[in-house]
Amino acid sequence: MPAVKSCRLRPLARAAHPLFAMSLLLCSPAWADEPVRRTYQVAPASLGAALTRFADQAGVSLSLDPALVQGRQSAGLSGAYSVDEGFAQLLRGSGLQWLPVGEGAFTLVPAPQAGSALEIAPTSIVGGLVAPGQSQPYAGGQVARQGAQGLLGSRDFMETPFSITSYTSEVVKNQQARTLGELIASDPSVRATNPAGGRFEQFTIRGFSLFNSDVAYNGLYGILPTYSIDMEMAERVDIIKGPNQLLNGISPRGSVGGGINVQPKRAGDKPITMFTGSYASDSQVGGAVDIGRRFGEGDQFGVRFNGVKQAGDTAWDHQSVDRQMAVLGLDFRGERLRLSADLGHTERDTDAPQERVLIGANAKVPDADDVRHNYAQAWSKARTNDTFGALNAEYDISDSLLAYGAVGARKSNHDFLRHNVSVINDAGNFSVQPRDFTRDESVRTAMAGLRKWLQTGPVSHELNLAASYYYMDFTNGGARYAAAPSNLYHPVATPTPGTPTRFDSKVYTENRFSGVALADTLGFFDDRLLLTLGARWQRVQVDDWSDGVKGDTAYDEEKVSPSGGVLLKVTEQLSLYANYMEGLSQGKIAPSTSVNEDQIFPPFTSRQVEVGAKYDFGQVAFTASAFRIRQPAYETNPASRVFGPNGKRDNRGIELSVFGEPVQGVRVLGGVMYIDSELTDTVDGAYDGNRAPATPEYNVNLGGEWDVPGVKGLTLTARGIHSSSQYLDQNNSKKIDGWERYDLGARYAFKVDETEVTLRASVENVLDDRYWSSTGAPDDSEPGLTLSTPRTYLLSATVGF
């Protein structure tokens, strides 16, 4: 889809100039007859930057010839304006004027002198949001131009000294992605490391683990459900690569490979009422509603509701999933004050969830192609229940000073009856030892900040000061039951657990993270050179009790982490950047398979250096980056079974990505990630030079869409995914082969009277290949194998009223 929908204009004679101007006005949106005034805050800056910010806030698209604004400055604006009045104020005395060229679209031209003809110069898109809270999509609609960057606010990807990809709700719908794990399958830097039919989702970014706990919700950590995140609630999903603690603070589980932010849905200016009926193999049937409205004077108030119910059997035998979600989003847009609130509740019940397959010292890596049945017992289950809420506020103190803040909370109850799958020999035998595991969580989190725009001579500044606080307490408990034998290739049904053989200790843990960050983005040469310098002070406090007895591994530590980034806009199409980022992570916790189970280790620091380039052709964009991330490595000693630090992990990699619509009706989304992951400084040098576990050398993704000529509304889709081989252990004695997955699909959009209908069908893993997709696990878990998802059919019908 084109970024700007313009009217077709023809050159006119000088005598027809008044008619030409009238035709332009007729192309303007209907609301131009009755101007709607809103409060805008645009700080003094270069004229191009000021116009871009105003277009973003106004929710319109602006196109211009960059040469027109070169070297020009703007005093900005503050107050209530219509779109017309805002442009007029910003352009006053510039010798330029704005002209409407379509619905919600404008261009910039030199103001004509008396008796001169009016000509429109070649243009490039520089800004404009679709609606407040919704980012302008890049060509093709799969990726958004802007993404959330925590402390620094929302920025265009071409003005960001980091690697970031923001996926739109449109790509979520078209991929029929039900969870975050299904959406990230499109990103080569991200991989799922837990079975799709498992108790929870878990990922890696740039080779380092990321948990659902580390996924932010509108900038707040710990709000979203712990084990699985439904995508029907997401307006946009931002994935930023590399440590980002300067931007977002320390994450609950200390992920350093990158961060993910889920942006909630907001009511747009146009009413929306959509119902989606869905089917997923083997017999999962469900429905979803999406309703949005604005009301009040000037449409100040908005409400958006999303609800989902889906239940049935999966493609695995005796496995079923029942998921429910309800999320309500409210917002208020005043002259200076903007408020939003989100309330959500999710429930997910899974019968016979799969676990990662652990491999004993005397067993080889099993043949995944021979695993044709669900090895999880029919009595095993996972029951999760999450209730969450968040309140966000922004207030324009002046035309150059913004105050913002947010608070959030979550209560969760989780109940599992599970068993490990630890293969002990080449025949695939393992022991089923049932474990009842309960976990209750309570989270409270808050953040507040100030953002100041100012000019010192020729240098612009964007100063950011922010403070954050995160509190979480959780209680773990459970029981163990008598063991029984089973087999990976020929599962044996074992009795439903009855009387426990022993009860686990009741462990209560409190985490408190607090921090203050300060950053300044300096703009030189009309903001063509942007330098961001900053640091974040953070304090990490962890306390734990076991059966009421305080543990001896609690800690209270603090650290200042400096970070910085630089971006050079070589041209309007080419940006070069570099960054140095530090990340503080909560200390690892010894897993249940180690003899020092639940021992808490001190926090540690990770460091990244990255350089990159971004090229925007207008309809298609390419990005490239080279990075290096170092952090301490941990492992459970195979002989002593003691968990602890063992050396450092050094990931050096290259990322390439592409997205957009290079040819009308053809859209692409994909990329490549190469990683050279090396272990160093291990105990006695035993593993020095070995490849770090769970890190493929190559990840490749490529997805394409084709609008079939001659059949309006029909689109065919295809996607290929590849990961190369990866090791299971630091010794590099066991590894899995590389794998490929192919997906195919189609959708058909049409109208019945005034009702919009979209039919979607897709097949994931078309070839029904069985393979181990990952050896991934965080350092504080036993490494295990993730089995691929069988061929899965997805069907849906969306009706918009």
Regions found by a protein language model. Name each.
Residues 526, 628-630, 645-730, 798-800:
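Gram-negative outer-membrane beta-barrel transporters
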Residues 232-235, 245-326, 332-338, 387, ...:
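Outer-membrane beta-barrel translocator/receptor signature
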Residues 61, 76, 121-270, 611:
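Acidic, small-polar-rich N-terminal luminal/periplasmic segments of exported/outer-membrane proteins
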Residues 578, 609, 693-801:
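Conserved C-terminal beta-signal and adjacent last beta-strands/turns
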Residues 349-363, 471-480, 567-610, 621-646, ...:
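Surface-exposed extracellular loop regions of Gram-negative outer-membrane beta-barrel proteins
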Residues 392-396, 402-408, 414-418, 576-577, ...:
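Membrane-embedded beta-barrel scaffold of Gram-negative outer-membrane proteins
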Residues 331, 441, 456, 460-462, ...:
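Structural signature of Gram-negative outer-membrane beta-barrels, strongest in the C-terminal barrel
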Residues 310-312, 327-396, 409-441, 480, ...:
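Acidic/polar loop-and-plug regions of large Gram-negative outer-membrane beta-barrel proteins
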